[in-house]
């Protein structure tokens, strides 16, 4: 195991110790040995996971480093699912820092891999993420196009949130008729009209 992989293994092992209550005096429990084997076989997945952990810990630079290394390995392995997830995660990392010009290409790259390995749920969320970036960068026409595409791919349980986003965009454009239409479409999906109208009034 090379030095970098050993570093990854140590970090993931620590997480496993903390989350599973495996801390004891045994040098390596079976689950840690199994974790090491998994990391050796799928280092890109481990890197993506560590990126998520560091993102949650608000360490954006470290998260970015792990994501970029995961992508480097993933591009070689052609693991499309991992590439989709990692590009989306990296896009979200940039979006949370308001670096929208870097977030957008990451989401679009994820979308390109979704053409190679279709997944309607991931496609819907990726399209929604792209729509949000266009909305934030004052490109409402493009945002509307991507929101509508996201709705067409979305599962019923997720559709209300996308309709809410689109409705709020129409409100910001003072297109009250279309905003109302989004409310009406979301109502039967959300179950609580008061909650829905409250969201639109924010």
Listing of model-derived features with the role each one plays in the protein:
Residues 50, 54, 74, 94, ...:
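Eukaryotic all-alpha helical interaction scaffolds
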Residues 1-45, 89-93, 130, 142, ...:
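Bacterial Sec-dependent N-terminal signal peptides
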Residues 32, 36-39, 48, 52-56, ...:
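Conserved alpha-helical positions within TPR/SEL1-like repeat arrays
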Residues 26, 76-79, 113-119, 153-158, ...:
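Short coil/turn linkers that connect adjacent helices within long alpha-helical scaffolds
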Residues 141, 148-202:
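Alpha-helical solenoid repeat scaffolds used for protein-protein interaction
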